[in-house]
């Protein structure tokens, strides 16, 4: 009964398929595995026995009768946004897509309810089904936006494969627990599941491990089987902490079908303290503008250390390796100009936020670090609020004869009385990056008030106030 029941459990949810850039694909995608590995993007291959011949042959489009392969990677919606920690697996998918293969980004609308224990020292905080559904919807939008930017801004003239977004809730939400355990559970051995490093480390921890977390690798293995059956997916991509889960999927599929599938891992990106970049570690840099602005994302990469930037250029960009070598030669000559970091930041910001987001990040950089009046004049309200997140925002009417001290007081930027007056005369106040020392100076449009109807008031070294003038 097991095989018929498994086929029944594997109904295809056609309504949740989203495709990007699917076209007829020409043969001849050379070095599909060699190029990303040379960039340091592919870390481990599983099983090792198949990586010398079977896996390269799978992706060799020059062979007669060869067809595009399908590769997938999972993204659990434990938060409402992707973050920098997700970028490498996404870039891995994009490299396969660029070589003419089809890729699937799988949102874990069901698996997120259990919580992946891989790489964690304690259990995740439980999420409600409603929260997970909302997060899954947000992740789908984020994945679609990144795929659209990739297709629009990084085309290389080759025909690409398709980019598909699925949600595993489509095949898990209607399954009955007893049926699932009866048909799927019998194919997993407890000794093997208990031997995984992710399980061992948690069992030895003071908190232990819940049954839900323990069962996570079974559901992920079933995801792989489902995609193998319905989309011909033979390769799973994941972070290096996912190898145990990938192995479970390989063993499950091989046991049921006798076919070989494969796993590829990408390196984990860590902070300077060695912590994995992610929201759980409290150091997430988000790929959602509402949580991390294009300027903040840009600056995150501009601030990378010299000893990391070449590696990051290879990992996070599509730039050819000879071009990266040239960038590094320029960087070594004048490291203070941060040529390599700026190119890295530009490429990543453009992929995540599009050309408009990159332009915004550069405007904000000029306005904040180079005191550019020209940049301030063309900044939108949103950009100013993103740049000066702690700034107070006021809307004021420009009355005839409005002075510097009037403006400061209406914006609640200085105290009343002599103390506030002295703050101006002693040089503690600037408007639009220009110091003002005469409290009675009348505001001048074009100097104190920019063309976009805004004024940036700075008190001391760190206190900013944004004023939007009405009825100009």
From Swiss-Prot:
InterPro entries, sorted: aa-tRNA-synth_I_CS, aa-tRNA-synth_Ic, Rossmann-like_a/b/a_fold, S4_RNA-bd_sf, Tyr-tRNA-ligase, Tyr-tRNA-ligase_bac-type
Enzyme Commission number(s): 6.1.1.1
Short motif 'KMSKS' region, span: 276-280
Broad EC category: ligase
Any one GO cellular component localisation term in the record: nuclear body
Residues with N6-acetyllysine modification: 350, 362
Chief location: mitochondrion
UniProt-listed GO biological process terms: mitochondrial tyrosyl-tRNA aminoacylation
Reaction catalysis annotation: tRNA(Tyr) + L-tyrosine + ATP = L-tyrosyl-tRNA(Tyr) + AMP + diphosphate + H(+)
GO molecular function, one term: tyrosine-tRNA ligase activity
UniProt binding sites for ATP: 76, 269, 279
Pfam families: tRNA-synt_1b (PF00579)
Short motif ('HIGH' region): ranges: 77-86
Swiss-Prot/TrEMBL keywords: Acetylation, Aminoacyl-tRNA synthetase, ATP-binding, Ligase, Mitochondrion, Nucleotide-binding, Protein biosynthesis, Transit peptide
Coiled-coil positions: none
Entries under CDD domains matching the protein: TyrRS_core (cd00805)
Chain sites annotated for binding L-tyrosine: 72, 116, 216, 220, 223, 242
Assembly with partners or alone: Homodimer.
Family: Belongs to the class-I aminoacyl-tRNA synthetase family.
Functional summary from the UniProt entry: Catalyzes the attachment of tyrosine to tRNA(Tyr) in a two-step reaction: tyrosine is first activated by ATP to form Tyr-AMP and then transferred to the acceptor end of tRNA(Tyr).
Identification of the protein by name: Tyrosine--tRNA ligase, mitochondrial
Gene for this chain: Yars2
């Amino acid at each position: 009964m097991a095989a018929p029941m498994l086929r029944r459990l594997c109904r295809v949810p056609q309504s949740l398929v989203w495709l990007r850039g699917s076209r007829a694909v020409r043969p001849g995608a050379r070095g599909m595995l060699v190029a990303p590995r040379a960039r340091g993007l592919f870390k481990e291959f599983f099983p090792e026995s198949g990586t010398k011949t079977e896996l390269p042959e799978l992706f060799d489009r020059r062979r007669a009768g060869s067809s595009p392969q399908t590769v997938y990677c999972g993204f659990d919606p434990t938060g409402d946004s992707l973050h920098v920690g997700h970028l490498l697996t996404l870039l891995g998918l994009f490299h396969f897509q660029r070589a003419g293969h089809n890729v699937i980004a799988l949102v874990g609308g069901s698996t997120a309810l259990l919580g992946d224990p891989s790489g964690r020292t304690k259990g995740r905080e439980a999420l409600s089904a409603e929260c997970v559904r909302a997060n899954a919807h947000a992740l789908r939008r984020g994945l679609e936006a990144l795929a659209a930017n990739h297709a629009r801004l990084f085309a290389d003239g080759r025909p690409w494969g398709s980019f598909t977004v699925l949600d595993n809730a489509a095949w898990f939400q209607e399954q009955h627990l007893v049926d699932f355990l009866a048909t799927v559970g019998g194919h997993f051995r407890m000794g093997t599941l208990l031997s995984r490093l992710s399980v061992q480390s948690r069992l030895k921890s003071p908190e232990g491990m819940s049954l839900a977390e323990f069962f996570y690798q079974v559901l992920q293995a079933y995801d792989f089987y489902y995609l193998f059956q319905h989309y011909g997916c033979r390769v799973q991509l994941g972070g290096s902490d996912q190898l145990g889960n990938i192995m479970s999927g390989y063993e499950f599929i091989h046991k049921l079908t006798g076919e070989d599938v494969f796993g590829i891992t990408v390196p984990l990106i860590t902070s300077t303290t060695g912590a994995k970049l992610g929201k759980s570690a409290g150091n997430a840099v988000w790929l959602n503008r509402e949580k991390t602005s294009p300027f903040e994302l840009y600056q995150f990469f501009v601030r990378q250390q010299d000893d990391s930037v070449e590696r990051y250029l290879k990992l996070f960009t599509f730039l050819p390796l000879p071009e990266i070598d040239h960038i590094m030669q320029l960087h070594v000559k004048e490291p203070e100009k941060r040529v390599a970091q700026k190119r890295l930041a530009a490429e990543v910001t453009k992929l995540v936020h599009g050309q408009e987001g990159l332009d915004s990040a550069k405007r904000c950089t000029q306005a904040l670090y180079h005191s550019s009046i020209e940049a301030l004049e063309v900044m939108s309200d949103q950009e100013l609020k993103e740049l000066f997140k702690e700034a107070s925002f006021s809307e004021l009417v420009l009355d005839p004869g409005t002075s510097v001290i009037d403006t400061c007081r209406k914006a609640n930027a200085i105290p009343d009385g002599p103390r506030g007056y002295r703050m101006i005369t002693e040089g503690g106040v600037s408007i639009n990056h220009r110091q003002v020392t005469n409290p009675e100076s009348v505001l001048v449009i074009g100097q104190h008030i920019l063309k976009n109807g805004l004024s940036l008031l700075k008190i001391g070294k760190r206190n900013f106030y944004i004023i939007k003038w009405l009825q100009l």
